[in-house]
A protein has these predicted regions:
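Conserved C-terminal helix/tail region of periplasmic/extracytoplasmic solute-binding proteins
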Residues: 364-366, 373-383, 397-451
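Hinge/lid segment of periplasmic solute-binding proteins
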Residues: 43-48, 116-171, 198-201, 314-323, ...
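Extracytoplasmic/periplasmic substrate-recognition and gating elements
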Residues: 52, 75, 79-80, 85, ...
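Conserved N-terminal structural module of periplasmic/extracytoplasmic solute-binding proteins
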Residues: 2-6, 11-122, 127, 138-142, ...
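Short helix-initiation/N-cap motifs at beta->coil->alpha
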Residues: 90-99, 118, 194-199, 273-286
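Short, solvent-exposed loop/beta-turn-alpha elements that line the ligand-binding surface or hinge
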Residues: 134-145, 189-193, 216-219, 239-258, ...
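Glycine-centered hinge/linker elements that transmit conformational signals in sensory
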Residues: 201-208, 245-275
Length: 451
């Protein structure tokens, strides 16, 4: 079995042993504000006139997980449309899906939810619990929103279940101070933020030999941050997670098997079933780990414990594309926007569409809505909203590395669960070929059932 960072060690390193229960918290917080309905349609106008009330549940998408930020956005909406009461609940990625699924089963789903196509289209949309948003997708919207984003927001029948606001490229990060300390910065193209697979493995080896026992973690306690573990494995030798048509899962390819085995064999890389992506970030920031596979611009901008771009102790954090043999990294993209649960109340559905139309499409508002996310606009018309911000300007380089948005493949929810279970089995010593064969069998069975 590969070594792992124990749960107790994580809690001690994070400095929160006395608050361990917080890691198991299962509730979101909520807030209420008054906002108004749009006159985008007669139904919406009717909703406004009757004082329709809607519930928004949002995952922690940059500033959209911060109540002050969200209330400011709702206040802008309220200034134009003052008659709808909006209740906001903030979800997390540990328990949020369970909360939503429980609400769906109990007939109390929110009217609005903010997340990505893998949930809104491939999961809840496929289950028939979402209201189509086809009327919001006007010809002008389709021309303005990037085609790669638009294609992820509808199903194979052409029904749209997401209206997007922002996007980013997920990447990884290294403690550049420590990398330079062990002389491994020679393996990194600091202008392009790229490196070869050989260079990555050499960097891991140099850090390990330099006295850093825990260089990186293949975290697998759950699905949180799993885009990072998928990306490191797929990129190393040119593997894919699904086929190009998004009909089946392909983790059992020779390229993926080679990558998983290389990571398992690398000293300093630990398959850790006790942590998820968010906890990996904490360990990276406090110096326990020297690399993080769960990273994006929101993490790079985080200044909770030090200035943006620095670890807690002041070391330089350098964002990196995942290593490749080809020199052509394929990063997982994050697309976030809004979906509407069909709760059978047309007035609420139209009021929710009004909110979406204002926040994500109004030319006088959409820029501020994107800025609140700390991500990038999905609309060409929004332009450069980060002019003069050196960190954001540098991070735009990663957008050119965006790969296929495969998260809309049928069976996605099952595949995510099977993925971290597969990594756990590898960590206990199960042969990689056997572990990925089980993953593919179970994930593709789910894909077939949902197709």
């Amino acid at each position: 079995m590969k070594n792992c960072i124990s749960r107790r060690s994580f809690l001690k390193a994070a400095g929160i042993l006395g608050a361990a229960g917080a890691l198991a918290a299962c509730g979101g917080s909520s807030s209420t504000s008054t906002a108004a309905s749009s006159t985008a349609s007669s139904a919406a106008a009717s909703a406004a006139g009757t004082g329709a009330s809607i519930k928004l549940w949002t995952y922690p998408i940059g500033g959209w997980g911060n109540d002050d930020t969200v209330q400011n956005l709702i206040s802008s909406f309220n200034a134009k449309y003052p008659d709808i009461k909006v209740t906001v609940e903030y979800l997390d990625y540990t328990n949020g899906d369970d909360q939503v699924n429980t609400a769906i089963e109990g007939g109390s789903a929110p009217d609005l939810v903010m997340e990505g196509p893998e949930r809104l289209v491939a999961n809840w949309g496929a289950k028939g619990v979402m209201a189509p948003l086809n009327d919001l997708w006007t010809d002008d919207a389709k021309k303005d929103i990037y085609a790669s984003v638009e294609s992820a927001c509808h199903n194979e029948k052409g029904d749209y279940y997401e209206y997007p606001l922002c996007m980013t490229a997920h990447c990884m990060a290294v403690n550049m101070t420590k990398v330079k300390e062990v002389g491994a910065d020679k393996y990194i193209d600091t202008d392009k933020h790229t490196w070869s697979t050989e260079g990555f493995l050499n960097t891991v080896d140099a850090l390990y030999k330099g006295g850093y026992e825990n260089v990186a973690a293949i975290y697998c306690s759950g699905q949180g941050g799993d885009q990072g573990t998928r990306a490191i494995i797929n990129n190393m030798y040119g593997g894919t997670f699904t086929d190009a048509a998004h009909t089946k899962y392909t983790a059992d390819s020779a390229e993926n098997i080679k990558a998983i085995q290389a990571l398992y064999d690398a000293k300093g890389v630990n398959f850790d079933p006790s942590i998820n992506g968010g906890e990996e970030i904490t360990l990276f920031r406090n110096g326990t780990l020297q690399m993080a596979f769960c990273w994006n611009i929101a993490q790079q901008l985080n200044s909770d414990n030090n200035d943006a771009g620095l670890t807690n102790s002041g070391d330089e954090i350098f964002p990196m594309a995942f290593p490749t043999e080809s020199g052509d990294p394929k990063l997982c993209g994050g697309i976030w926007g809004f979906g509407i649960f069909d709760n059978g109340d047309e007035a609420k559905i139209e009021a929710a569409k009004t909110f979406i139309d204002f926040i994500a499409a109004d030319p006088d508002q959409v820029g501020a809505s994107v800025l609140a996310s700390t991500y990038f606009p999905v609309r060409e018309s929004v332009g450069d909203i980060y002019a003069g911000n050196d960190i954001m300007s540098e991070y735009t380089k990663f957008m050119s590395y965006l790969g296929d948005y495969y998260q809309i493949t049928p069976g996605w929810a099952t595949a995510r669960t099977e993925w971290w279970n597969m990594l756990q089995r590898v960590g206990t010593g199960e042969p990689v070929e056997q572990a990925v064969a089980t993953f593919v069998q179970n994930a593709n069975a789910a894909a077939t059932a949902e197709a």
